């Protein structure tokens, strides 16, 4: 399992906000479209924190 920390773009605040930490089996890459919590997101950035052994995912909701 890979640990991911999800940050979702908040248009009102104009910044990424922490959402939650999840475990997922597959590797997720920048530019990929994912489904999470019944919503569609585009992965706009991926940052691997080697110290914490987690991957930060920065997501923007796909309104299409």
Which stretches of residues belong to each language-model region?
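Short beta-strand-centered aromatic/proline hotspots
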Residues: 39-48
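Short acidic DE-rich linear segments
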Residues: 1-2, 61-64
């Amino acid at each position: 399992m890979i640990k991911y920390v999800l940050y979702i773009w908040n248009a009102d605040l104009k910044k990424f906000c922490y959402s939650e930490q999840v475990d997922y089996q597959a590797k997720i890459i920048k530019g990929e479209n994912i489904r999470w919590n019944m919503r569609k997101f585009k992965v706009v950035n991926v940052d691997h924190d080697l110290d914490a052994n987690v991957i930060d995912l920065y997501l923007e909701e796909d309104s299409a």
